[in-house]
Design a protein with these regions (language model features):
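Periplasmic N-terminal accessory/gating domains of Gram-negative outer-membrane beta-barrel systems
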Residues: 108-171, 177-210, 227
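C-terminal beta-signal and adjacent terminal beta-strands/loops
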Residues: 269-270, 274-275, 279-282, 286-288, ...
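Gram-negative outer-membrane beta-barrel transporters
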Residues: 593-596, 615-704, 796
């Protein structure tokens, strides 16, 4: 069936093609390397023109002859070029930003009316310049903290890099770093993300309307594009903050042929120790609210949380580093090789010595092998690992993947963009071992698992006429659980295995699944200023991140689909209205969505650690439902820029063996959230920014009380996620200053000073409820918060 669909895509596109020769290429920002979507290419003699797509690519069809091209984009200096066209040619353009014009234009890197005319719905695009307008956290511009401010996206807890998209779990978010999958995105237990802003040129978040070329997750895709090295001149930057120091280098190893980009960060332990002295902790408190949809009673959150507990991860015995690299080799005007890599590692003394980290690499060959055709071949490696030594015991776990992807892009004319391809990924899961270091064979070993996830896909972004644009795509995914390993049948009551079948070879298929995933989006242009959009997506997910605690931690494990754990299928419907005012200076949007989940997973009650022989038996699946409404008002241009967003959403699960088979709030359900962002560019070198966040507290499961046996307390529960943490809110303020006198004194070296005030009014947002034994041996609730007021400063030098 998929072959027929691909043939149909190609047939439709070919029938729409036109005769003539082509001028094609890519238009980018010369400084940042960011692809410029919506840049104009105009031929002055024939008055024919076109604009670039979201990846900065253009295609112009003309007969043989001499032509004069004018390449322009708002906020950039234009380029005039004369060409003689007697064959299909490729010309890439690099536009230089106009510093004066850039102050008053949208710095997103896309056309100002892209939100109106494109087929994208439930999609957010940000350039690194937009990200840098947000107040920094501990001296670091943070990609993950920034996307948590977007409509429909919230954080899982204070300071965490994990994020929730429309009520779904964080494992339902596919995170890509230049095409490399990332399985854990945090440093320092969530204070920092693994994305170094100096190494990022832009990002795209798909909350819905996910293109068919992406797959494997049910909720969203975060596609982060890493920075390319400058192919003409050397650039270097260094910076230092209270906690971290970092550097970046751009080097044209062979001018216009071979470039290198390298960036690194590391903790400065003395800075961490200093900050620990600034914040000595305060009382925590708050009220726990019963989730009215589930019944229950309120309760007070009592007790204190010490500064030492709150901020101990700043102690000098915790550190991290990461390195980003990218090498681009331009073989000729039609081919290039791209090598990207990432290495990151955390180490800490918490309960013994702990370390975790990511390693990833990608090799991509891009080839414009024929008229209107582009080929991308990628080989990708990614690994996440964690280990802990506590006393005489050693625990380790992780996941690693190796994949290959072949994609073809076909541009028959300016109204169609066709892509189709194939991808295959081998997955190796280490579910953990607990070893006794004093014994040769002592310990507990969890059997590893292996899987192969593959897919065929095809898609077309089709402008039908001046009013209607249609995106349509299909993805056919396959999953095979591979040997060696045991395939068990479990007793439904005890979860003990009652039958086992052993598969000895790596090529043995223990279980198989396939899913057909249609994707469609429609844009109807009501006028040049407003449009109506709708979309439908089906996404299959074969991996799940299983967590025992209320928060996602570095030691949580990824579980593949097996005979006993079915894949999750998510069907999402979205409808939106988009309106731009005053020549695209103000953008208003409103979207509503409805998601149906089949195969939603959660752990059964009674599991207290991962080191059990039959872990998959405790994974229960059922159905889920998420729906909501998002609205946003944005001003992306001018000296004052900002955004106001409000989200309403519900997310509930229903699993037969949990909560007596009744619907219950999913642990990442946050009913209301509000974000306000603002940036004042007071002068060309001085700006002030602020963010305010509010969200409903997330659901938690708490004991109703305790019963005592032989003087020992045993808790008892009634219902899953019956209560809620107190609501979350926070105000941050940032100041950015680039002294011009320093630039003059230092001969052109640019210095930027970032000052950030995190949590200005010192709100102690509770993220976890603990129980301590109080008076009369009774247990009391203690709300634990992490961060209070945190000032920080960072100095960056570019030369």
């Amino acid at each position: 069936m998929i072959k027929k669909i691909q043939i149909a895509f190609i047939f439709v596109s070919i029938t729409l093609s036109q005769d003539g020769l082509t001028i094609s290429g890519k238009i980018t920002d010369k400084v940042s390397g960011l692809a410029l979507a919506g840049a104009n290419v105009f031929e002055t003699t024939t008055e024919k023109g076109t604009s670039t797509n979201v990846e900065g690519e253009y295609l112009l069809l003309l007969p043989e002859g001499n032509y004069k091209l004018k390449v322009s984009y708002i906020g950039y200096n234009s380029i005039d070029s004369e060409v003689y066209l007697n064959k299909n040619i490729t010309i890439n353009f690099q536009l230089v930003p106009d510093p004066i014009a850039m102050r008053s234009i949208d710095v997103s890197g896309i056309a100002p009316d892209h939100n109106i005319k494109s087929t994208e719905i439930s999609v957010e695009r940000l350039s690194i310049r937009q990200v840098e307008q947000i107040p920094v956290v501990m001296g670091e511009t943070d990609i993950m903290k920034t996307i948590q401010l977007l409509p429909g996206i919230t954080s899982i807890a204070e300071g965490r890099s994990g994020y929730i998209v429309r009520g779904s779990g964080i494992d339902q978010n596919l995170i890509l770093m230049d095409g490399m999958p990332i399985y854990y995105s945090s440093h320092m237990q969530g204070l920092y993300s693994i994305f170094n802003s100096d190494a990022v040129k832009g990002l795209t978040v798909y909350k819905g309307g996910v293109p068919a070329r992406f797959g494997g997750r049910g909720a969203s895709v975060l596609d982060v594009q890493m920075r390319d090295g400058d192919i003409e001149q050397y650039r270097t930057s260094i910076s230092a903050g209270l906690i971290t120091s970092k550097f970046s280098i751009e080097a044209p190893l062979v001018k216009n042929k071979l470039s290198l980009f390298l960036a690194g960060r590391s903790t400065r332990l003395s800075g961490g120790s200093l900050y620990d002295k600034i914040n000595d902790g305060t009382q925590t408190g708050g009220r726990l609210n019963s989730d009215k949809g589930s019944g229950g009673k309120g309760d007070d959150s009592k007790g204190a949380s010490s500064g030492a507990d709150d901020f101990r991860f700043f102690a000098p015995n915790e550190s991290w580093y990461d390195i980003n690299g990218k090498v681009i080799y331009n073989i000729n005007e039609k081919q290039n090789l791209n090598l990207s890599f990432y290495i990151g590692r955390d180490s800490a003394y918490t309960v013994g010595f702990t370390e975790w980290g990511n390693r990833a690499a990608l090799l991509r060959w891009e080839n414009r092998f024929a008229n209107k055709w582009l080929s991308n071949t990628s080989i990708v490696y990614s690994k996440y690992y964690t280990a802990n030594i506590s006393g005489i015991y050693y625990f380790n776990s992780g996941v690693s993947t190796q994949s290959i992807k072949q994609e073809f892009s076909f541009f028959p004319n300016i109204n169609n963009e066709v892509r189709f391809g194939i991808t295959s990924e081998y997955q190796d899961f280490n579910h953990g071992s607990l070893e006794d270091a004093t014994l040769d064979d002592g310990g507990k070993f969890m059997p590893g698992m292996q899987g192969l996830e593959s897919a065929l896909y095809a898609e077309n972004d089709h402008k039908i006429n001046d009013k209607i644009s249609l995106y349509y795509g299909i993805r056919n995914s396959y999953y095979h659980q591979l040997g060696p390993g045991d395939r068990f049948t479990y007793d439904e009551v005890s979860n003990e295995p009652i039958q086992a079948e052993f598969f000895s070879e790596k090529s043995d298929v223990m279980s198989s699944y396939s899913s057909l995933e249609p994707r469609i989006a429609l844009t109807y242009l009501l006028s040049e200023q407003n449009s109506f959009k709708l979309s439908y997506n089906r996404n299959a997910q074969y991996l799940r991140l299983m967590s025992l605690g209320a928060e996602v931690e570095w030691y949580d494990i990824w579980m593949p689909t097996t005979k006993n754990i079915k894949p999750m299928l998510t069907d999402q419907f979205a409808v939106g209205y988009f309106h731009n005012f005053n020549n695209n200076e103000i953008k208003v949007s409103a979207e509503t969505y409805y998601k149906i989940l089949n195969g939603a997973a959660d752990f059964e009650d009674g599991l207290h650690n991962y080191l059990v022989d039959n872990l998959e038996a405790y994974v229960a699946t059922g159905e889920g439902l998420a729906y909501g409404f998002e609205t946003s008002v944005e001003k992306p241009t001018g000296k004052f820029t900002g955004r106001l967003s409000y989200n309403y959403g519900k997310s509930d699960y229903k699993i037969d063996v949990i909560n007596q088979g009744r619907w219950y709030p999913y642990r990442f359900d946050k009913t209301h959230s509000l974000t306000m962002l603002s940036n004042f560019q007071l002068t060309s070198n001085f700006s002030v920014s602020s963010t305010f966040l509010y969200s409903t507290g997330r659901p938690v499961t708490l004991p109703e009380g305790y019963y005592y046996i032989s003087g020992l307390p045993f808790p008892y529960w009634e219902g899953r996620n019956k209560y809620r943490l107190p609501d979350y809110h926070r105000l941050d303020i940032g100041i950015k200053y680039s002294p011009t006198f320093l630039k003059k004194w230092t001969g052109g070296i640019k210095t930027t000073i970032d000052v950030a005030l995190y949590n200005v009014y010192d709100r102690r947002n509770i993220h976890t409820i603990n129980y301590v034994q109080g008076e009369n041996s009774l247990f009391e609730q203690v709300g634990q918060s992490t961060y209070g007021f945190m000032p920080s400063i960072n100095i960056n030098i570019e030369f």
